Amino acid sequence: MTRQGNWYVGFAVLMGASITVAAHRPVTAQAPAPASGVVTFARDVLPILQKHCQSCHRPGQIGPMSLLDYSSTRPWAQSIKTKVRSREMPPWDADPAYGHFTNDRSLSRQEIDTLTAWADGGAALGNPSDAPAPITWPSGGWLVEPEVIVDLPEYQVPASGTIEWENIAIRSPFKSDTWVSSIEILPSDPSTVHHMCFEFKTPQPNIVYNQYEWAEVPRDADGAASRRQGAGDNWVLTRDAGSTEVKRRPGRPTLFPMPKHCYVPGMSLHDYRPYEAGLLVPGGADIHINLHYQTSGKPAVDRMRLGFTLAKQTPRKKLVQLVPTGTTASFAIPPNESNYAAPVVEVRIRRDAELVWMSPHMHFRGKDMTWTLTRPDGRQQVVLSVPRYRYAWQLLYQTRVPVPAGSKFTFVAHYDNSAANRDNPNPNVWVRPGNQAWEEMMVPFTWLVVDTEVNDRDVTSPYTRGDGA
């Protein structure tokens, strides 16, 4: 549970543990109040770890140590105590005054007291017969056993340098229209992955399969992207999968995958089953992928896998993703500004829906983000407030809130570019929008459930933006 220098370790227990494991982790007994005497691992601690920690803290997952059994947990007793008392672990940044979340991973006061007493009391094992049955996890690192698996090409991650966003197209295994009930994205080396997103797209002419392509991005000494002046100044770099040879050509990329289905370390499973929902994959559609790897000082190799489960019958519902953004051309954070307000974003909902998932996405300077739902009768409800955003713990918050047609979402975010922000790599520079972590984004990812017959384009009106709040 120690915080590592690289952000991805912190990112770990976040979204997947939050978004999906709540729906798929086998039910475990609630830890009882410790009986008088010594708090033990078997009776008192293990139920807490099963409920809150083991989804990520097990072999093959992103957690830096396993917490499956006593021998692997005992050396970390004092660290566990420190992290849970400070509420750094498990990560949960939602203001408890707003919203109700079905995947709330925060510990109760009783659970914190139990873990503290265990560490302070000698971290005893206790009677092994008091332990709950171990959780049976799917093989191969999956959270849900897939019925269809797609292997992506192996990716060689260099030891150093800036890796831009890369895109690649591969063929889909779905030859006829297919409803899938879950999608899981599984890297072989999560420590190298900033994100991976993909979407299904109708085959297009001139697409080269199994070839990475990315836009050449000129950068200044601070790593900020320099804007090209004319279309003739644009260049695209390409590399065949499995090759190290990079080719350069004028023009623009041919692939533009939207972030429909994404992996970030810790968020790997998109599960539609709790909502009686599914995703319709058109027969013969290609898979267009956007990848962003990060260097760590040593070369690495990753190979992504996509796992799908199939719907047994046509679902009644589907998920629609909203990707509003406040990082417009006017977005610019001054040096040493501690409370920069991004342009306020509003989204009007035109069809009856249900709010189910929310995930604030910012980079190093992100400070806070709030979702406010205004219903047609004017009633307002803060459905999510993240007052202390941490880039290392970008959580996904799962809820169920009715959203009648005519409602409006308002998204507000602030940024801290001062030296007081411990994640800030340089408070003395202007910060503008960009893909790298030292640049910025303001994206309040939001997912709604609607009836399957609803056209996705009919769910919202065009996004609007105002001045910073």
Regions found by a protein language model. Give the residues of each.
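Short linear sequence elements within intrinsically disordered, low-complexity coil regions
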Residues: 13-16, 46, 97, 106, ...
